[in-house]
Amino acid sequence: MSVKQLADDIASLSNDLVGDAEKQGSGNQAAGRRARVASGKIAKLCKEFRKASLAA
């Protein structure tokens, strides 16, 4: 996966995370779970991004 694609995926998941975190603040527990899942995916993508950026 290219650095550009990884950056786009991270940005998209970050937007989802922010939206779900706001919903969780309003008491939506399902949104809290989605936010936690998104944060895990972001962490994995950040590791891949770091490797890809060093290889580029």
Predicted segments, located by residue:
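N-terminal intrinsically disordered, cationic/polar leader segments
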Residues: 1-19, 25-26, 39-45, 50-56
